[in-house]
Curated annotation (Swiss-Prot):
UniProt xrefs under PANTHER family: FUCULOSE PHOSPHATE ALDOLASE (PTHR22789), L-RIBULOSE-5-PHOSPHATE 4-EPIMERASE ULAF (PTHR22789:SF9)
Cofactor entry: Zn(2+)
Designated name of the protein: L-ribulose-5-phosphate 4-epimerase UlaF
One GO term of the biological process aspect: L-ascorbic acid catabolic process
Organism: Escherichia coli O6:H1 (strain CFT073 / ATCC 700928 / UPEC)
Binding site residues for substrate: 26-27, 43-44, 72-73
CDD domains in alphabetical order: Aldolase_II
Gene (name only): ulaF
Functional summary from the UniProt entry: Catalyzes the isomerization of L-ribulose 5-phosphate to D-xylulose 5-phosphate. Is involved in the anaerobic L-ascorbate utilization.
Active site residues according to the UniProt entry: 118, 225
Binding positions (Zn(2+)): 74, 93, 95, 167
Length: 228
């Protein structure tokens, strides 16, 4: 698991590097599906002092199997998403400013241009709010459940992120670094959408044919963007 712990450590260290977190906020995880184990950031440990060996290994029930620290308080959310969506290899949660602002406003991040469409096939959805019972109960588990309720059976890698109402963004990808990459993009397109709607409050969504073109040329069966 040492290689995966190193990858998760590096991905977590990318969060302050890209301005996605403040203090000890945020967490990144990755899963080893063959072993049924997840590596995740320890709870409340400062990025400045964190080391790869500080990463915590848990099984799919959340039991710590390796590590000196408690795992992230959001571990149950990560595990619920891994259980539901086999294509996920890494998950990240941040409180990045603009994506969190959309979450606090209770609004999906609208697909307004090609930058958004290069990564997200449509709006980045916002979940419903959790009930008092859901918050007072198994809060982190129920956060995962409301994300799944919102995504449904859609392929999560086609919309690799979501904003949780009054909370903040979660993003995911094929591995930990891909998840962080998508979180960075989500923050950028959230900022772009806010600026664009400030300039033109009547601004409509990107044309569907343009969105389809940009997403499919990077992610479709006949994708031709980049090098092979």
């Amino acid at each position: 698991m040492q290689k995966l712990k190193q990858q998760v450590f590096e991905a977590n260290m990318d969060l302050p590097r890209y301005g996605l977190v403040t203090f000890t906020w945020g967490n990144v995880s990755a899963i080893d599906r063959e072993r049924g184990l997840v590596v995740i950031k320890p709870s409340g440990v400062a990025y400045e002092t964190m080391k790869a060996d500080d990463m915590v290994v848990v099984d799919m029930s959340g039991k710590v199997v390796e590590g000196e620290y408690r795992p992230s308080s959001d571990t149950a959310t990560h595990l619920e998403l891994y259980r539901r969506y086999p294509s996920l290899g890494g998950i990240v949660h941040t409180h990045s400013t603009h994506a969190t602002a959309w979450a606090q406003a209770g609004l999906a991040i609208p697909a307004l241009g090609t930058t958004h469409a290069d990564y997200f096939f449509g709006d980045i959805p916002c979940t419903r709010g959790l009930s008092e019972e859901e918050v007072q109960g198994e809060y982190e588990l129920n956060t995962g459940k409301v994300i799944i309720e919102t995504l449904g059976d859609a392929e999560p890698l086609h919309t690799p992120g979501i904003v949780v109402y009054q909370h903040g963004p979660f993003a995911w990808g094929k591995d930990a670094h891909d998840a962080v990459h998508n979180a960075v993009v989500m923050e950028e397109v959230a900022k772009m959408a806010w600026i664009a709607r400030s300039i033109n409050p009547q601004l409509n969504h990107i044309d569907s044919f343009l969105m389809n073109k940009h997403f499919m040329r990077k992610h479709g069966p006949n994708a031709y963007y980049g090098q092979k």
